[in-house]
Amino acid sequence: MPEVVFSVDHSKSMRDQAVPGHNRWHPDIPAAATVKPGSEFRIECKEWTDGQIGNNDSANDVRDVDLAPCHMLSGPIKVEGAEPGDLLIVDILDIGPVPQTNGPNCGEGWGYSGIFAKVNGGGFLTDYYPDAYKAIWDFHGQQCTSRHVPGVRYTGITHPGLFGTAPSPDLLAKWNERERALIATDPDRVPPLALPPLVDGTLGGTASGDLLQAIANDGARTVPPRENGGNHDIKNFTRGSRIFYPVFVEGAMLSGGDLHFSQGDGEINFCGAIEMGGFIDMHVDLIKGGMETYGVTTNPIFMPGRVEPLYSEWLTFIGISVDHAENRNAYMDATMAYRNACLNAIEYLKKWGYTGEQAYLILGTSPIEGASAASWTSRTHVVRCSCRPRSSTSTSPRRQGPAEGR
């Protein structure tokens, strides 16, 4: 086993760890550990809400989750010799839930997925499913099942939802400027268009005093992906993957977490993956001056691993950029098209005995593929959502609904 450079006690909050992590992006968060280029190491991660969700049959905890401290990230890990303009190579060697443990903490033999309430985060289909729901998933090696979504069994593509490097002061200022401008276009929207810096709930690693206050005042929230990486939620970012992260500060300052047991493309219900605590083993290296050499100016480059389950048969649901309720055609609207593809898949699954909420959870947690099939040639954007029809879901599940919160 590689050296553990960031460890967590899953029975404790991230705030109470021997070396705490953080939940904001900021260039001045102190390093939690230092590694050399070419080294292999393990990072242990808390579940992203820091233990707010329990293994029970009520979705009240999902409904009432406090998003101010999310995501709880492990790190930052300083890489010796990394300088602005370099590329940080990160290889994922292994990843999984808490090893050989069954217990009350998320990742100890179980995980969860949820539909967030519209008034507290929402999801991709929040106008159709505005209430909170939750499903608990039990892990059986590489597979998982849920008492709240009967008849379903997945082979998980385990992956981290969130990893990234620290922003420079200038880049952080750009983030805050553009996201505040977006919020200003519709400041009363529910859910909000973006999340500005928030002092409440800020954790800045070992920072204290004036430094912690500066991090709280200006630190970027971790919900969106940005130039540094961040919350990409790419299901194929699993064992065997390689990522080229841009470096913006000395040492790169790599951080991450938000581990997932399984997820569909898009993580459409926001808390849509099967969330878990656990570990990730990594190898890191550097390409000096790599950002200029390889034209990496705005976002990381990903090379997905090849360990996902191989499915030879699929059902594919098509969505087009048409508002069917109003009979209105939109021009190349990929968001509308994917929403329609998901709604079409849900209506199909409901015919097999699932509730709409269960079907929504299935799309968020099963390894479905979403893709843009046509745009310019048809003017009406076409998106597909593909699901495996056999061995994943039963055709006659019991109608036991997922845990519900009102």
From Swiss-Prot:
Gene3D superfamilies: Acetamidase/Formamidase-like domains. This is Acetamidase. It catalyses: a monocarboxylic acid amide + H2O = a monocarboxylate + NH4(+); acetamide + H2O = acetate + NH4(+). Keywords: Hydrolase. It comes from Mycolicibacterium smegmatis (Mycobacterium smegmatis). GO terms for molecular function: amidase activity. Allows acetamide to be used as a sole carbon or nitrogen source. Belongs to the acetamidase/formamidase family. SUPFAM superfamilies: Acetamidase/Formamidase-like. The keyword Hydrolase applies. It holds the Pfam family FmdA_AmdA. Residues 387-406 are annotated as: Disordered.
